[in-house]
Amino acid sequence: MEQFFYTETMTVMNADADFRSLLKPSALLRYVEQISTDHARAFGMDDQFFKERGVTFLVGKQALKFDRVPQRAETLTLTSRAQVSKHGSVKRITTLTDAEGKEVAMVDCRWIVASLTEGRILREPGWTVENFWNDTVEGELPLQLHKCKDGLTSAGEWTAHYSQCDLNGHLNNAFYL
């Protein structure tokens, strides 16, 4: 069966690299957030689309795997595929390949559709977009959350400032990495 996907090319910017000129994981997660947004917009799912339906996408869980950490100024091809909602979660796999076509990283992200009016997770989005969703998407990373058995030690408190928040007013998932 044909897989529906969305592809973009990005270059690792200076601000997205660490002191060793290697791509920071936080920057990679921002790239994935951006291609996911661009993919939705390319199929008509823009801000107005979601506003009219009173819903938003939220990141439930995500995991990333580097096969090789890209360097500053390196050009990467990002390819993202979304699976139909199952049990209230949309699986989205994004792969990054280098100029030679070798996979350098993969991100497994589970998106959740939430109703802004009802304040709850929706099992199904309530709409469909032709050639956007795949019945299945190959690839997966471990998404298990490990729970601390001995209690947690506070690392302090942090106030989320305006410049650290996304369009929904939430602390950006990539900010704290």
Task: Give a label for each model feature.
Residues 101-103:
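Residue-level signal for glycine
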Residues 1-59, 106-108, 114-177:
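Hot-dog-fold acyl-thioester-processing enzymes
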